[in-house]
Amino acid sequence: MKIPTRKQMARLAAIVGAIALVAVTATTSSTAAPRTHTGFAKIRLAFSTWNGYAGLVIGVKSGMFKKAGLDVQYSVIEDPVERFNALKAGSLDAIATTPDTFARTYARGIKTVQVLGLDASVGGDGIVADKKITNVKQLKGQKVAVSAGSTSQWFLAYVLSVNHLSLKDVKQVDLTSGDAGAAFAAGRVPVAVTWQPWLDRTKKNPNGHVLVSSKQYPTIITDQVGFTPSFIKDHPETVQAFVKAYGAVIDYTKSNPDKAFGYATKYLGQPVSAIKATLKEVPLWTLRQSRAYYGTSAKHGQIYAIFTKAGQFWKTIGEISSVPSPNGAIDPSFLTKA
């Protein structure tokens, strides 16, 4: 199955880049967090169009969040800049995105605390190369098409680092991830960092192959939910209830995939069969998997190292001036208690 990318999914939205606000109750323009009848604060959450966020939509549309006493409203905001600006302005309480994105924005003063893992890219992203290039170390000196400042560039930097190389060792050609795949297919570059469907297309290319994919690095590109520090401070019981309820949503989804994903077809613009087919490359995490990724405050999970490495990467290319500490940006306690 050719899994749609975040950008491809955005094109399927009715209005690309616009805010499509969906609420369990009526939308409020207030920046406060009103209480529900259970005493929990309303949660205003934003994310882009992506299969890994289906569980959040299912939680709202199925009524499972509401049944848990939660009032969750979500906004689909494709542009990450708009998303974080809304968070900074106080119009949102939480955002779902990747740890590398959280690291960059945290260092720029838009602070969030990651509390819950949603999914991982397990083969949905990768590096394609000429068949003559058989290992990562042979990328040294090669032209590599990659989108500057993107998660794809972060993935490249990470793969190079574990093979004792850096971005300085390759000649980067700045192209979007989709265009990078097309450039490789056309023979204009010997290497490209891209995603599906270009990875599958490369497998059919007699002159190319998938050198490495996120299947070999399943903890690098993941999605998390991060709340503002003030929301966590003022409403810890709401965050705890949200994490617990999300776990129940995923358990329900795994037991009843046809019915559960039926709630997400409009959001994703895909039929249930297509959504289910993407699960091999974008598996939705259970709370158990999320706990393993986060670890505890005493014994950190992999997310801490990923966050730090991402921060180091952004600093190296001049996107941020200092590397943020993961200790204030990650809180595993809600998962521990869920």
Question: What do the PLM-derived regions correspond to, one by one?
Answer:
Residues 50, 78-81, 96, 146, ...:
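Soluble non-cytosolic domains of exported or imported proteins
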Residues 234-316:
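Secondary-structure end/capping motifs
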Residues 1-40, 338:
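Short, low-complexity disordered leader/linker segments with a strong preference
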Residues 307-338:
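Conserved C-terminal helix/tail region of periplasmic/extracytoplasmic solute-binding proteins
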Residues 93, 100-101, 172-173, 178-269:
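Pocket-lining segment of extracytoplasmic ligand-binding domains
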Residues 33-174, 190-196, 212, 219:
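Short, glycine-/small- and polar/acidic-enriched structural segments
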Residues 167-170, 269-281, 321-328:
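Short, surface-exposed acidic
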